[in-house]
Amino acid sequence: FLFIVQGEGRGHLTQAITLEDMLQRNGHEVVEVLVGKSSSRTLPGFFNRSIHAPVKRFISPNFLPTTDNKRVNLKKSLAYNLLKLPEYFRSMYYINQRIKETGAEVVINFYELLTGLTYAFFRPSVPYICIGHQYLFLHRDFQFPDKSPVQLWMLRFFTRMTALRSSKKLALSFREMERDDEHQIVVVPPLIRREITAIQPEEGNYIHGYMVNAGFADTVESFHTMHPEVPLRFFWDKTETEEVVRVDETLSYHQIDDVKFLNGMANCRAYASTAGFESICEAMYLGKPVLMVPAHIEQDCN
């Protein structure tokens, strides 16, 4: 197997770690992991420590935040990525070369746009499978929220682009849904890591949290000003800061580290996050109350 992983946030990286472990335990081999990168994201240390296959990087499209660093700025993101098209074409050429040179028999795509475009333009002979909760958005029975029709169309269009010419789409879901053979979608349970299933959760006194965009620190601090007695421990991707930023006795920010993150999740009172998928599944599995604050249209749908 060859993995191609979108490098935005923690979720797709966590899925790749979990699936590699599952495949290896069943006698399969992951020959290489290709991870998309951009100027605004660095690869978290926990990924390099946890994944066993060789990791290679390629330049990939990414979404730029608004000036307050909370939600995605769609117009700015579109303009930025159009300017980067020559680099993305080089990345597609590189992905095609790695598919050939690794001798992989199957490619697994973790919602990376350039995988779909590579298969559209270069037509590799190796079959590929897409995996991610986002493929539920293409399922005939998925219920969308009452949001902008244009943004919902763009979300579904982007999701289709990640899966051009794919053999199958594995849609991760909390609940069971029928197969959608017309769209080659099979609904499967979330990829929960063995570390989570082995944890004995306890109820602590603090709120555990994760924010992809550090701009949400303003919101956290507003809550903290009103409720200074509530301990808050938030993880973020703000790489230019110390490993732990301790604001005061009851508020601290931590660089994303999976072992510390899972321990924090296991012993917290409740979990607060942008409305991603993987960490929400982990919190639900451990029986923790969850607060979700959507940061973009995909998370509105989540």
Task: Give, region by region, the residue ranges found by the protein language model.
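A short, glycine/small-residue-rich beta-strand->loop->alpha-helix junction that serves as a flexible
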Residues: 5-17
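Conserved nucleotide-sugar phosphate-binding/catalytic loop shared by glycosyltransferases and other
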Residues: 7, 25-83
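Short, polar loop motifs at secondary-structure junctions
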Residues: 35-41, 111-114, 172-177, 234-243
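An aromatic- and histidine-rich active-site surface loop
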Residues: 42, 107-122
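Conserved nucleotide-sugar donor-binding subdomain of glycosyltransferases
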Residues: 69-106, 113-114
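A donor-sugar binding/catalytic signature common to diverse glycosyltransferases
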Residues: 107-110, 262-302
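Active-site-proximal region of nucleotide-activated glycan assembly enzymes
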Residues: 122-187
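Donor-nucleotide binding loops and adjacent catalytic segments primarily
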Residues: 189-268
